[in-house]
Structure formats: structure tokens, C-alpha cells
Amino acid sequence: NNINYLAAILVISFAGNVVFSQSQYPSNLLAQKGNFSAGAARALGQPFQGVATSDGIIPGLFPIKSTGVSTAPIREAADRFLATLSTADLSRVHFAINDPEWRDWSNVDVGIFPRRGISLEEMNEAQKDSAWELLAAALSAEGLEQTQNIMKTEQTLFEINGEPIRYGTEKYYFTMMGIPSSDSPWGFQLDGHHLVINYFVLGDQVVMTPAFWGGEPVYADSGMYEGNHILQNEQDAGLQLMQSLDAAQKRAATVDPEKVRNNQVAAANQDNLILDYEGIKGAELTSQQKLNLLNVIRSFVGALRNPHAEVTMDEIGQHIDDTYFSWVGESADDSVFYYRIHSPVILIEF
């Protein structure tokens, strides 16, 4: 039901339509497309439980309660966006609040994993404007800028690789779940390459998870968006925390001293991931190191609009002693690394 869904999702921590026929796909891309579709189908075939440790879901972590922070600006922006859509557009965009579309997202490009909904690429100017107004109402200024910069990396990828089937700054799709309301659950999803936002609203509570913020290259040294960069604050905050640990703490935090593979585990199709804690526990950190840890978390949570971000940070802070920080790789200024932050109420991977 809707109440259980809220609790579960919180645990996880314009021109014309551009359509490409199967004949336009290279054979290797078609094979990848098939593999991703099959993986998504398998995941959606399993009942949703949520991310948990091997001890199971902890009940009662996320009560439905008033935060005292109005969601009216988000709701009104969503209404304005929906009002710009035609009947045909609405049939593609609108889903029931409990539709599996919530789970049917991916961080890979649209050439490999087709999306539902309507893309920025297909919208007219009025629709684009209202879509961006919705994002501006839902996100902080920093979150909005990061969203825009991630989309710009797609232009850089196109300049490097070509392949208009796969890459483009407007190949990002909007869907709406439920009907914007002051008291009933609703939300929206933005889904595309390296950028996924699932945004759930109930009364004055907001949950923005699961979310994926990524991109390549992280810095564009040429092209239309030369100088564009992404995820530097998240990178620097994590490294600063690791470098603040003493030798014994670093040993406790380090899962593997060598970064030789993709260590991400909570990607698409991992709604029911069983993941036990690793690394150093928050209770083993000094007061300053705990503040550093919260600063890393804030670099992600801060993409959410304020004061909703502060509400989320307060929830996270209540579990800081039970929050684990783990590291893969070395910790010099120029090292390649991965880190994870994992607590009863949030899971972050970088």
C-alpha cells in the first residue's frame, strides 16, 4: 500500500519525436539492449522489498509525519507542467502511484535502455520551460545546476563518439506517478543517461531516492561545453574525510587498497539488494570527523530543495553513530577511489 511504499522507498537510501528503428541499431548495441531489458524484466518480476542488510528491513524508521515544510511550490509546478501536455502526451507521462515504472529506471543511455514518458527532446518550448520549472521547485540551486551539467556531458559524449541514437542533452524522460495533491501520495521521475531522479511527495514529506548522479567525462576540456565539470564537491568531500582519518581508522575504513574494477552495487535493478555494513563505524570517529562525514552526505542530500534537505539531514544525523564509511583504493590527492556511506536510513556510493 502507499504507506508501506513510502517506508520502503526511504530505506533505499522539442521538436518532433525522435524514434530509431531496430535496423538503425548496430548488432552489438542491440545485444546490449536485449541484455538490459531482460535484466529489468527479471528485477520487476520480484516483489519490491527495499535495500536491507542480512538482518532484514528495520520497521518504524520512516514514520509518516508532518515536517512543517510546505510542498505547495512543487505541487503547483507539477500542475503547470501537466497542463502543458496534450491528451496523447498525458497518456505517456501519467502512471498510477504504485506503478512499477518507479523501479524501471537505468543509468545507461537510451540507446541501450529505452525509457517511457516524454523526453525534453520531444517537448515544445512551453513544455520544456514548465519541466525545468518543476525541477527548479523540487531541487536546490546546486541540484539544478548539477542536473544541467550532467546533461551537458551528453553533448561532450556525442562530440567524442557520435551515435545520436545514444547521446544528447535532451534525452531525459519525465513521468508522473499519481496526481499532484496536498494529502495523497504522488511523485515524478526524471530518467536518462547518468541522471535519474525519483521524487516522492506525501503531504509535506519529500523523498528523493533512489537517485543517480553521474557522467563522463567529469571535466570537458574541449567542445561546446568546454570547462563543464560535475561531481567535484562529492569527490573532494569524500577524499577530505578519508584523509582526516588516522592510520588505524584508515585500515578500518579500507575494504580494498586497490581500485581495479567498478565497485558499485546499488545500481538499477537492485531494489531488493542485501548489503551488509563495511568499513569504519561513525561511533569510532572523532567529533570533527563526524562533521566531515555529515559534510560528505550533505554534498549529495543538498541536491534536494531546502528546507527539505535539512529535514533529511536531521534524520540521517540521528543515526550518525551507526553510519559506516568504507573506501576502496588509495587516498592521495590524485588517487582513483570508491567510497560508500551506509546507515539504516541512507546508502551513498561514489
Residue ranges of predicted features:
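Bacterial N-terminal signal peptides that target proteins for export
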Residues: 1-7
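Bacterial N-terminal signal peptides
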Residues: 7-16
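Sec/Tat signal peptide C-region and signal peptidase I cleavage site
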Residues: 17-21
